[in-house]
Design a protein with these regions (language model features):
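Phosphate-group recognition and catalysis centered on beta-loop-alpha active-site segments
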Residues: 1-260
């Protein structure tokens, strides 16, 4: 079977606090080829990595206690965000972990030779913020993949980051596949489908993988799979769908992909 590229979702989030430098560093050191992360922007225009709009789910006061009020990252300067701890919620051993700057993750990725998948939360930013984000990526020459859920998003990426790959995470029929392929070719386009319903209960039924769906995608794009509960499920999905890439929270290791 072909080798499947593994990407670490928010770093190795099953073993480390998600979207932190320690989690990203672990992903690189464990041999994942790509790291998925969530971009946000602070009140003073600093690009940071955080899944939610609010910091409360993964941030704590320095003593480990919950933050008393809900705080939007867009209402905080980066200096204000640094007052909170982003590791202790996961385990006391990660006390002191801070909210990472995106530019520091770019530096780490360059040092470790891994690429970055930028989640489609990028498109929740204002246009001028996105353009500044693209400028930062261009200035560093980083190897990035941008996650898109609409053709308009994909067109924007192609115009402003013409070397970047696109990860299409939305529903995609054959006509859209053909249009995307005409712009990006197969090498710059990956279409993602979930595997297990229990891990993506919110997803539309017709989004899930099937041999027929995989066969329709693969002539036009690389195939990515996600929502994979176990190594056995991963190997079965590889047998059925012949994916090019898979996303994991850390339960599937690079050595498992080598065996697929």
């Amino acid at each position: 079977m072909k080798k499947v590229e593994l990407q670490a979702h928010r770093g190795v989030e099953s073993e480390y606090p998600q979207n932190t430098m320690v989690s990203f560093r672990a992903a690189a050191e464990q041999g994942y080829e790509r790291i998925e992360l969530d971009p946000r922007v602070t009140k003073d225009g600093q690009f940071v990595v955080l899944h939610d709009r609010k910091i409360n789910s993964t941030a704590r006061n320095p003593d480990g206690s919950p933050i008393g009020k809900e705080l939007l990252i867009s209402d905080l300067t980066y200096a204000e965000a640094l007052e909170y701890d982003f590791g202790i919620w996961f385990s006391p051993e990660f006390r002191g972990e801070k909210l990472p700057l995106f530019r520091d993750v770019l530096t780490l990725a360059a040092e470790k030779g891994v690429s970055l998948k930028i989640d489609n939360k990028l498109f929740e930013m204002k246009p001028e913020e996105r353009y500044a984000f693209y400028g930062l990526v261009r200035a560093t020459g980083a190897d990035v993949v941008i996650s898109c859920v609409t053709e308009a998003h994909a067109d924007e990426v192609n115009a402003l980051l013409p070397e970047a790959e696109v990860s299409f995470d939305g529903l995609c029929d054959n006509e859209m596949l053909k249009r995307l392929n005409a712009v990006f070719g197969r090498d710059r386009l990956t279409v993602w489908v979930p595997i297990e319903r229990r891990m993506a209960e919110w997803a539309p039924t017709d989004w899930f993988a099937s041999p027929e769906k995989a066969a329709a995608i693969l002539p036009f794009a690389k195939l990515g799979i996600w929502a994979i509960g176990s190594v056995d499920s991963f190997h079965e999905a590889c047998r059925l769908y012949h994916p090019d890439a898979a996303e994991t929270s850390g339960n599937i290791k690079p050595s498992d992909a080598m065996e697929s």
